[in-house]
Amino acid sequence: MSDPDSELPEEPNVDPPQEEPKRIVIPSILHSFYEDRPFVSCTRCGESLRDFSEGFRISKSFKGDEVIIESAMCMPCMAAMMEETSDESKQKLEKFHEKHHREVSGFDECALCECTLDEVRDTEFNLVGVCQGDDMLDSAMICFDCQEAMNEIISEETRRTWDRFREENFPGVPADFEPLPSRPAPLLP
């Protein structure tokens, strides 16, 4: 007697259908405070952010509920900024991230330590979103202490490059303004 199952054709190996990632629209907290709308163009090159299939990154620094500085940069400009970063700084930042990076996403807790947004809400912190079109693909909160720790390890060459970027793209910001100081603030007389 033959096995009835052996006469059936084999089912092809088919992976179960993949669920589409849930679409997350860029939240209003990452819209431009100064323009009172979503970011439209790259802070560095001025091109339309929608023109970059690679996406873009929005960064906003806060002191309490006040926006201190904000930018949106296309990925090619982000890559160019990294190219302008000294090799010494790249190596130190890579080691820092290897040691401290946490597998968390969102704004509830720091991506580099266990500090929560509630704990830093009244101080300084950064919010970052990696976006494409109208969608936010990933996000992170970085507390002041972690930002300061990264600022302390960058080289003077990199610091000058980043200062030049700030001066060229944020002309209204005073030359001695440090949204996340990398050096002690000068004492007032």
Regions inferred by a protein language model and the residue ranges of each:
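Short recognition patches in nucleic-acid-associated and regulatory proteins
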Residues: D36-I68, S105-M136
